[in-house]
Amino acid sequence: MQGRFRLPCFRASKIELMPTKLDEILANTLMEVNARKAAADYPALERKAAAHTPRGFVAGLRKAAASGPAIISEIKKASPSKGLIRADFDPPSLARMFEAAGAAALSVLTDGRFFQGSLEYLEAASATVRIPCLRKDFMVDRFQMLEARASGADAILLIVAAHTDETLSDLGDEARRMGLDILCEVHDREELKRAEGLGFKLIGVNSRDLRTFTVHPELVTELVQWKTTDAMMVAESGIGTAADIAKYRAVGYEAFLIGEALMRQPDPAAALAMLLEREYSTEL
């Protein structure tokens, strides 16, 4: 098993005439992943991965969606476009509160340079809750799947804009081999078609183009109309009120990833409970 993760890194994106922000992030990610691979204690990572039984990210969302909106609460400290989002940042505490407030799952940022995240945040958050957790990062190498499961992840993110169909398929296969579910992120009609063609069953729509970091709010409502499979759809942006959730549910979304709108609130869990229109007590 050890040798399997010493393969060369995948090519993460097509070369364009002018480098984009996504290209910059992917290049940095590849460099960091290669450094971690070179220093990795594979037997220890494999033992940690084996000790974590994936909790079924997609199954958890479907169960929640059967009786209401399935919320993926995101534990996010910062972003390249917004800078520091939350200074008072305690992932285990946030995880417990989000679970108590009704989150169906968690998303934890693990990119350090651009989002001030870490695998340690993921591990700490995952260890404190029963609901499944997503490793949200720029996945470019099979090794990251081992890291994800070893850190308590139950699912990983694959961003269509970062990959060819070949690398999407390869990384998807590796995630499934590791027992991890996949949230496949798209931001235009072509990417949706690619994600569906490759058989992804959980597809998220992000209105932010990661190549330019510009936002097109109308994408969330427009793209779902072009869905041609039974994939579960996740709205990943533009959600700030219960009315927003109702609007997106009406056009076909069942799950909702909410990050900044919650993390900027004095009490993120109370804000989540308000979105879900349910009562919440701070006494855990």
Task: Say what each PLM segment does.
Residues M18-R86:
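An N-cap/entry alpha-helix motif that binds or orients negatively charged groups
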Residues I25, S73, F98, A148, ...:
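Conserved, mostly hydrophobic/aromatic
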Residues I72-D90, P132-V140, D181-E185, V234-G238:
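Active-site mouth loops of central-metabolism enzymes
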Residues S79-K136:
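Glycine-rich active-site/cofactor-binding loop and its immediate structural neighborhood
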Residues G102-A103, T128-I131, A150-I156, R176-L180, ...:
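Glycine-enriched alpha-helix->loop->beta-strand junction motifs that scaffold or abut catalytic
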Residues V140-S151, R189-L198, I239-I258:
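Catalytic cores of alpha/beta
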Residues E147-T167, G204-F213, Y253-L272:
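Glycine-rich phosphate-binding active-site loops on the catalytic face of alpha/beta enzymes
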Residues E222-W226, R264-L284:
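C-terminal helical cap(s) of enzyme catalytic domains, especially alpha/beta-barrels
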